[in-house]
């Protein structure tokens, strides 16, 4: 009986140890997956969201699709293909946004040593609000890329006046899209970088770098957190701070030519910044 009791005690003790090891192993696996996808941001995300929940919202793959992207796509299926929809119902911010974008673009386009005015690529274009008001007045041709087919279908009507200058529409998620090599004078990326993981944003910026012509520039315009990284559960996006963004830019082989804060937005809004980037091979 004493031997039997010792046997059960031994088995019970090791069962507990096995449970601990399994639990810690699972935590390690989840942690590693998140760190792989959000290598610059994951510690900030884990401060706010428990590990298992964060994994389920981001890195978990269900039916072949990563949940960070699947949830964003579900969100945008409910967004109307209108200017109001593109602005998140803050349509009053559209005019100051357009004006600031035009002025920022002028600093880097036209003239010796600057980007040309041949072809621009509008990434995460939606219905083409930026193309219509910022890019088409400047460039001979514009291409649009967005993951939502409904937005691109509406863009064909929305941009009808300039349809002869719209070269093509690409229905792709940006993590799956590769710009044509050496094709673009300007690649415009606005309010969409937060829908890419750190890993995929780094890779996408690198591919955009390769898509630039000589003296071409990337314009990155997005919300910038005051500190750390903020995860928006409603639309499955992240807002990165300046240090995280600049680190990803640097690692992608790009350098910052200039940056400027968007003015004219309410103080309660998350700050919006514009960055002009080009290949570090031209530095």
Curated annotation (Swiss-Prot):
GO terms for cellular component: nucleus. Its main location: nucleus. One of its GO terms (molecular function) is N-terminal protein N-methyltransferase activity. Keywords: Methyltransferase, Nucleus, S-adenosyl-L-methionine, Transferase. GO terms for biological process: N-terminal protein amino acid methylation. It is an enzyme of class 2 (transferase). S-adenosyl-L-methionine binds at residues 124, 129, 146, 174-175, 190. Belongs to the methyltransferase superfamily. NTM1 family. This is N-terminal Xaa-Pro-Lys N-methyltransferase 2. It comes from Mus musculus (Mouse). The lineage of its organism: Eukaryota, Metazoa, Chordata, Craniata, Vertebrata.
């Amino acid at each position: 009986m004493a031997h039997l009791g010792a046997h059960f005690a031994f088995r019970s003790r090791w069962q507990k140890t096995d449970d601990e090891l399994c639990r810690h192993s699972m935590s390690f696996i989840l942690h590693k997956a998140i760190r792989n996808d959000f290598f610059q941001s994951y510690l900030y995300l884990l401060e706010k969201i428990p590990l298992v929940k964060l994994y389920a919202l981001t890195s978990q793959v269900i039916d072949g699709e990563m949940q960070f992207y699947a949830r964003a796509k579900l969100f945008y299926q409910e967004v109307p293909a209108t200017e109001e929809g593109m602005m998140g119902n803050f349509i009053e911010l559209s005019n100051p946004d357009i004006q600031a974008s035009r002025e920022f673009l002028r600093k880097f386009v036209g003239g010796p040593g600057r980007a040309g005015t041949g072809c621009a690529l509008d990434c995460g274009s939606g219905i083409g609000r930026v193309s219509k008001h910022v890019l088409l007045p400047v460039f001979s041709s514009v291409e649009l890329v967005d993951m939502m087919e409904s937005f691109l279908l509406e863009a064909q009507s929305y941009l009808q006046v300039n349809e002869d200058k719209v070269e093509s529409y690409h229905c792709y998620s940006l993590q799956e899209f590769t710009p044509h090599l050496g094709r673009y004078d300007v690649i415009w990326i606005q309010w969409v970088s937060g829908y890419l993981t750190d890993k995929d944003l780094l890779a996408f910026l690198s591919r955009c770098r390769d898509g630039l012509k000589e003296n071409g520039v990337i314009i990155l315009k997005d919300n910038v957190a005051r500190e750390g990284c903020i995860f928006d559960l409603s639309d499955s996006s992240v807002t990165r701070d300046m240090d995280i963004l600049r680190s990803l830019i640097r690692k992608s082989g790009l350098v910052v030519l200039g940056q400027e804060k968007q003015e004219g937005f309410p103080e309660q809004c998350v700050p919006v910044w514009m960055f002009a980037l080009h290949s570090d091979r031209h530095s």
